[in-house]
């Protein structure tokens, strides 16, 4: 479970370049980042993550180390939504500064079982490496037919959403990212837009959200690019 294990990776894997994002970034291997930037690297992903959850990951990361570069996947879906959908899935006790309450995780019977299983699997050469951990592309076969089979095409909306429909939610999310940038001026932050499927954009167009989504992307660029370390 990424929400449990990202805390440990952020605390214990020293890296000069850190990739943070949703499952859209999960298949970018750390080894690729190492090769590209010539530095040590680690990937920290929270599937369908909210900015409050990414904030917890960042707090742990910067509490234990000061990476040279953070690469953050600026997903459109997560950028434009508010925090109303956040669940209790994030184990707050693993992300706070108190090591004593981590005991409930360390002595959990499932944790002990899977830890022993992982250690034995790695010993036998059958376990996942950190490079492959939490990737999901190895057992999937993608083509246009399977993509269309899983796509429920919406009806065309009667009206377009106003361009500023997401403005306030985007501003609230960007305020979180701005705090990372301003509190860590010696770290370079590279924000990128993960490549969404053409079916995503078809859905956006048919739902009348095109201008609102583009406005959100422009808002992100205008907000973040004003900083020297972005």
Stretches with model-predicted labels:
Residues 2-5, 50-57, 174:
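N-terminal post-signal-peptidase region of extra-cytosolic proteins
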Residues 14-106:
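Membrane-embedded segments
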Residues 43-48, 162-167, 203-208:
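Second-shell loop/turn segments in exported
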Residues 1-14:
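Start-of-domain marker
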Residues 74, 83, 87-188:
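Secreted/periplasmic serine-hydrolase-like ester/acetyl group-modifying domain
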Residues 70, 189-191, 230:
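Hydrophobic/aromatic residues located in beta-strands of well-ordered beta-sheets
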Residues 181-207:
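Active-site segments of SGNH/GDSL-like serine hydrolases
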Residues 200-230:
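Substrate-gating cap/lid alpha-helix
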